[in-house]
Design a protein with these regions (language model features):
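Non-catalytic, polymerase-adjacent accessory regions of viral genome-replication enzymes
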Residues: 1-46
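Non-catalytic, well-ordered alpha-helical scaffold segments
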Residues: 6, 34, 38, 74-79, ...
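Glycine-/proline-rich flexible loop or hinge segments
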Residues: 16-27, 57-68, 95-97
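Active-site-flanking structural segment that lines cofactor/substrate pockets
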Residues: 35-64
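Short Gly/Ser/Thr- and Asp/Glu-enriched loop/turn motifs at secondary-structure junctions
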Residues: 52-54, 234-237
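Conserved pre-motif C helix in the palm subdomain of viral-like polymerases
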Residues: 63-96, 196-227
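Active-site-proximal segment of RNA-dependent polymerases
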Residues: 82-142
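Conserved polymerase palm-domain catalytic core
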Residues: 122-236
Length: 237
């Protein structure tokens, strides 16, 4: 890889620093910021970077979810590979009706599409809107399938880094921590919170996870739109 300090510093200052809610993390990072970033560049350029452990916690709004939060350094890498590699290389394979977490798209764009589709179909006496949801989608993303979808598009060192990110939840401490959280919450809602199966599941919250999720079912999007000819279609997630 050819990672330069300016790119890494820009991601930290304009994305991580501005959007992080954990000010203690930032405070500790700031004390040795430049030395940490120099070290990170060295590790990435020499293919010796490894992902640290996740901070795993529960959120209750808008619904109960397990969140896995990376360290500041790992968040920088996560954003870097998404911005530098995933989006530029893979976006051309995504249909514009696949709208989640994409620039100039998202929920507002989805609402516009729905309104447009309804107006178009008002010429018919009757039409239907079908809404489907994939249960525990992020937890059911298969590592092997996802890696096979990536391997032909990236150089070996970039692909290896992407695989490290994908594999980062395949660790025993993850489920141990999830089970501790569930045991400490007095609510039936935690019963539906899944643990991570071996070779499956992406952490909710990572930028890479968000992009992997929209890319993972891109083949399904094309099948529905072009093979089934269902052109009034939107996928969010």
């Amino acid at each position: 890889m050819n990672v330069n300090l300016e790119e890494i510093l820009d991601i930290y200052e304009n994305i991580i620093y501005k959007n992080s809610r954990n000010k203690n993390k930032l405070y500790n990072f700031e004390k040795n910021k430049m030395s940490i970033l120099y070290d990170l560049c060295y590790k990435l350029n020499n293919n010796i970077y490894d992902i640290g452990k996740y901070n795993i916690f529960l959120i209750k709004y808008p619904k109960y979810r397990i969140i896995m939060s990376l360290s500041v350094t790992d968040k920088i890498v996560n954003h870097y590979v998404t911005i530098k590699y995933l989006i530029p290389v893979l976006s051309k394979y995504l249909d514009n009706r696949n709208i989640a977490t994409r620039k100039n798209m998202g929920t507002d764009y989805g609402i516009k599409l729905i309104k447009k589709y309804i107006e178009i179909n008002k010429k018919y006496d009757k039409f239907y809107i079908l809404k489907l949801d994939i249960k525990k989608y992020f937890y059911n993303i298969d590592y092997v399938v996802l890696k096979n979808m990536l391997v032909d598009y990236f150089e070996e060192n970039v692909y290896d880094l992407l695989c490290k990110i994908i594999d980062s939840t395949d660790e025993e401490y993850i489920n141990t921590r999830i089970n501790v959280i569930k045991s400490n919450v007095n609510s039936n809602k935690v019963n539906d919170l899944p643990c991570c199966e071996q070779y499956k599941s992406l952490p909710i919250g990572n930028m890479t996870s968000q992009f992997f999720a929209i890319y993972y079912l891109s083949g399904l999007d094309h099948f529905i739109i072009h093979n089934l000819h269902l052109k009034y279609y939107i996928r969010y997630g």
